[in-house]
Amino acid sequence: MHAVTKIFIIFIFVFILWTLYVENDITNRTRNTDNIDDLLESANRLERLLKFEAKKIAALAEDVHKIRANRKGKHVIMEEMVSQDLKQWKDPIPVLVFSCNRAMAVRDHVEKLIRYRPSQEKFPIIVTQDCDNENVKNEVKKFGDKVEYIKHLAGDKANITIPPSHRQYTAYYRIARHYKLALNHVFVDKGYSSVIITEDDLDISPDFFSYFSSTRYLLENDEKLWCVTAWNDNGKQENIDMTAASTLYRSDFFAGLGWMMSSKTWHELEPIWPVGFWDDWMRDPARRKDRQCIRPEISRTGMMSYGKEGASKGQFFSKHLAKIKVNDKYINFGKIDLDYLLPANFAKKTNLEVMKEAVELSIDNVASFVLSSENKGKSVRVMYDGNIDYIRKADKLHIMHDFKAGVPRTAYDGIVTCFINGIRIYLVPDRTKVSAYNPDWSVPPSFGE
């Protein structure tokens, strides 16, 4: 029985007793007409008592209502907490750091990883070295038991078969071999279910680990995903929304440069792993199989100055890589519902933002549109009808204009987005002329890098 009901019964009982008392009092008092004042006083007392008890009952009813509402609210909050907790990946996610002969680079990179790492048990760091460089080994050993160091026969001593026409690309063959050996160590020897892959010339953001651990459940539950990357190829400060540090996207483009994959994906790729150029090999439609990656608006990795000394001899470094902005604000992705990145949700969201909310303009009109302060917060779309058209329009927006297996960098369903002067801009394929990605698309030499 509720408290209000009990109080009401007691009140009725008291009221009946009081009424009997008053009636008896009235009977006695009517014998004496001189006691009229006493009768009126009794009636007034009864009226005041009724008002007082009514207020008490109303107050108690309000308290009961609040208690019920609070219980319901706590129940909803608990359900949300349980739901979100189920999305937090419980298994360890090792960070596999690839190194060769840059001692200071690996020192700086590992220092950053340790500084931002919330737990050594959750995020063990494994540094794998390919070259016989004692300085690198010594720098890694200084970290003691904070990291694991692994070493195998160096690539220059492994008698790798390299086609005569590819002698100048020898480093890429050694790197592919290194990746296979190190990833087998993580997934076969150690038995981990996922890995974050980094290179010794990368800078990282304060929320690097939050980003990867909170997106891991997406990799597990979405068969259309095969990686989470920390890198935005168009992540120069003038091309991104600096207020959108928590914004993430799906992308058909495999970027690398700080990325995560599952053991399931590795067990698929390992038997057919290439002898060279592993990243372009992964971008091939035969391997990608229309799968996608998660990428951020603001990169969670950046390129340190050591990058210009890498295997690519600084290709793209000064013009693009060195200019990528690394996020400097901590975002707790564990408190954000990332289900909007699931395939159907993201497709619906993108269609709304691109085809319904954005205004269609020519690339020439976009230039004047972004200069007007009145247009801040608006979005526009620019259509393209082929690779040359895309290259020209990308150049006007100062974003990367190249393709890998026909996929523009950062593209999702052919759509490439950037953010300039407060305006969201979408480069969108004209589906009457561009039906799908074309692996034959390339950049003519006349357009440069």
Curated annotation (Swiss-Prot):
- Principal place of residence: Golgi
Report residues binding Mn(2+). 201
Q: Which GO terms describe its biological process?
A: protein N-linked glycosylation
An annotated GO cellular component of this protein is: perinuclear region of cytoplasm
Per the UniProt entry, the Enzyme Commission number(s) are 2.4.1.101
Cofactor: how bound: The cofactor is mostly bound to the substrate.
Citing just one GO molecular function, the answer is: alpha-1,3-mannosylglycoprotein 2-beta-N-acetylglucosaminyltransferase activity
Q: Which Pfam families does this chain map to?
A: GNT-I
Q: In which pathway does it act?
A: Protein modification; protein glycosylation
Q: Which residues cross the membrane?
A: 7-23
Which UniProt key words apply to this protein? Cytoplasm, Disulfide bond, Glycoprotein, Glycosyltransferase, Golgi apparatus, Manganese, Membrane, Metal-binding, Signal-anchor, Transferase, Transmembrane, Transmembrane helix
Annotated active site: 279 (proton acceptor)
Topological domain spans for side Cytoplasmic: 1-6
Name the InterPro entries on file. Answer: Glyco_trans_13, Glycosyltransferase_13, Nucleotide-diphossugar_trans
Q: How does it sit in the membrane?
A: Single-pass type II membrane protein
Q: Per its UniProt record, what PANTHER family does this chain match?
A: ALPHA-1,3-MANNOSYL-GLYCOPROTEIN 2-BETA-N-ACETYLGLUCOSAMINYLTRANSFERASE, PROTEIN O-LINKED-MANNOSE BETA-1,2-N-ACETYLGLUCOSAMINYLTRANSFERASE 1/ALPHA-1,3-MANNOSYL-GLYCOPROTEIN 2-BETA-N-ACETYLGLUCOSAMINYLTRANSFERASE
The Swiss-Prot or TrEMBL record describes its family as follows: Belongs to the glycosyltransferase 13 family.
Could you tell me what this protein is called? Putative alpha-1,3-mannosyl-glycoprotein 2-beta-N-acetylglucosaminyltransferase
Give the source species.
Caenorhabditis elegans
